[in-house]
Amino acid sequence: MPPQRSRRRKRASATQLYQTCKASGTCPPDVIPKVEGTTLADKILQWGSLGVFFGGLGIGTGAGTGGRTGYVPLGTRPPVIAEPGPAVRPPIAVDTVGPSDPSIVSLLEESSVIDAGITVPDITSHGGFNITTSTGGPASTPAILDISPPTNTIRVTTTTSTNPLYIDPFTLQPPLPAEVNGRLLISTPTITPHSYEEIPMDTFVVSTDTTNTFTSTPIPGPRSSARLGLYSRATQQRPVTTSAFLTSPARLVTYDNPAYEGLTEDTLVFEHPSIHTAPDPDFMDIVALHRPMLSSKQGSVRVSRIGQRLSMQTRRGTRFGSRVHFFHDLSPITHSSETIELQPLSASSVSAASNINDGLFDIYVDTSDVNVTNTTSSIPMHGFATPRLSTTSFPTLPSMSTHSANTTIPFSFPATVHVGPDLSVVDHPWDSTPTSVMPQGNFVMVSGWDFILHPSYFWRRRRKPVPYFFADVRVAA
């Protein structure tokens, strides 16, 4: 292995060596002439400059600026620059002071009275007070002085400035109190009238479509119900068979404080130590048990709770865990195997001894304007002498037409009609005879309120799935 050569160290510059070795006198012979400018080249330049002058041409090692006067065209002279001279002060007037002049200078100027030669007019008074003087003893007449109270004049000045860049139609101006001689004067309007025109506004948004909304405040539409996702893939399913899940669910998670179980309708939060064991293995690492909810699933009433496990916790404090759906079925909803015979609500015929509407009577209108053909009924149309019972069989759908209404009643079985008691009906003549068209066939007139529509004629209702709901009518957190 060849030996390693030592690295070459850089020598200090001449300026650095000159600063350290000049005082001690140990400088190399080439350092002092180079720094002080006494080399052979420097001496040749000094000797040559004595005989030749190139200062005006700008020849040298400096920047090519043409010297102090700059570059000028050939055959011309450089411009003359006037140099400023010394400033000249204004002359100061000097007053001579003699020996007889006073040494005290007055700070106030002497005022002189100028007589312009204007005569002073005489002013003659036409009224006033008469002054009486006496030389001896007290005055016999007391002095009467007419003293009138001075007029109390109140002057209030208010200055108001308005910004032309901002005008508010409803600017509240607070009152400006002004107190003069113990009096408080307030006279300022509080609300200034506006100058704009009031235009009634109309509502143009009439739909509740929130997808194509062009305004900032759309009309709120129906709110969709929240989906809990109890049976999703990310939620574990754990059935609970013990009844303590309904009354005291905290006993299935922890042993702490068995005397206080908390409210079963609220969300339960648990704080576990680092090493613990749950009473029920299914409730291991549960840190939160949300509010109960009721639902209908597979023909039974089910009580459900969402639990949150704590599987991992980072140094920052972030917790990770899975969601568990704990449910307990209360009772199955099954159909009874016992068959109960149902009794009909109404009979097929109305008997004469029926007492459903004993206080109601059937009143028939006058049918003198009705064209009746092929009538096999024995119901009287005018006066009634005694109550009668008539039974009529109709093989088809009969109908009756009058000037007031058309009535069609389907009957395919013998009907017994109770005529009612004797009533006198007043006959009112008509101005014109109406024309009625009545189809061929039998008819029957029924008047009463004691009949019920058969259940088979009702519309069938579609069953909707039972949604999930909470015991306290709030969404679980």
Curated annotation (Swiss-Prot):
GO terms for molecular function: DNA binding; structural molecule activity. Keywords: Capsid protein, Cytoplasmic inwards viral transport, Disulfide bond, DNA-binding, Host endosome, Host Golgi apparatus, Host nucleus, Host-virus interaction, Late protein, Microtubular inwards viral transport, Phosphoprotein, Viral penetration into host nucleus, Virion, Virus entry into host cell. Disulfide bonds join C21-C27. Minor protein of the capsid that localizes along the inner surface of the virion, within the central cavities beneath the L1 pentamers. Plays a role in capsid stabilization through interaction with the major capsid protein L1. Once the virion enters the host cell, L2 escorts the genomic DNA into the nucleus by promoting escape from the endosomal compartments and traffic through the host Golgi network. A motif (Nuclear localization signal) lies at residues 1-12, 459-466. This is Minor capsid protein L2. Belongs to the papillomaviridae L2 protein family. Interacts with major capsid protein L1. Interacts with E2; this interaction inhibits E2 transcriptional activity but not the DNA replication function E2. Interacts with host GADD45GIP1. Interacts with host HSPA8; this interaction is required for L2 nuclear translocation. Interacts with host importins KPNB2 and KPNB3. Forms a complex with importin alpha2-beta1 heterodimers via interaction with the importin alpha2 adapter. Interacts with host DYNLT1; this interaction is essential for virus intracellular transport during entry. One of its GO terms (biological process) is microtubule-dependent intracellular transport of viral material towards nucleus. InterPro entries: Late_L2. Coiled coil: none annotated. It is found in: Virion; Host nucleus; Host early endosome; Host Golgi apparatus. HAMAP family: PPV_L2 (MF_04003). It comes from Human papillomavirus 42. It holds the Pfam family Late_protein_L2. Highly phosphorylated. GO terms for cellular component: host cell; host cell endosome; host cell Golgi apparatus; host cell nucleus; viral capsid.
